Amino acid sequence: GWRVVAGVNGDYYDTANGIALGSVMSDGVFHNISGSYYALGFYDDGSAVMGKPDLRISAETDYDSFSISAMNYIRQTSFGIFMYDDSFNARGTIGTSEPGYDVICSVRRGELSIGGEMTLEVEDIVEGSVDTAVGRGQYVLSANLNSGENYLNALRALRVGDRITVSVDANSSEWDGVTNLIGALYQLVENGRVCSGLSAGNAPRTAVGLRRDGSLVMYTIDGRQKGLSIGATIQ
């Protein structure tokens, strides 16, 4: 294996629940999927890709297709279909007992990967104020009962035994084949130019840069220690 000589932290997370804001993948397995953040991805050969992949989760059945808002994130009250596996929390549940509509599925073929497909089969359907359990090898598609009718109708059309093809796609094929990925909140530089609209506040910072030759440079700056380190802005 590799001899590790240094490490840096990455992404931001929700301090209330520890969930990363951006997408997370390790050894080819997605732990979170969110389409709205920047990311740093690695291929098996160690090369990297950086940018905003705009990940999209799509579901298709024999008679319908619909979008999934995110995987392993807190279910929103008023919109969206969310997907969960058994790693979302220590209880192995979807994490909420607010009234919802949950479709419990098992994996029949494939796995979630960028540019790939996974086939699910509907095993059970739960409606009500239930913190639905997610077993090993299962996924749950879930929507709050206050969500828009289009989301609820997509789930209510499903029946036990139905097959669902779930795919994850990026805005560029350069993300296909990535096996490790971590999110980032800001892009600092693009094509050698500093991006506009960056925060001016000082704080501890971690940054990663991708050179034109494909090599990486990593920065970590301490902060919030009066008299020792005040951190840095991201401008």
Identify the role of each PLM range.
Residues 1-235:
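Gly/Ser/Thr/Pro-rich low-complexity, intrinsically disordered segments
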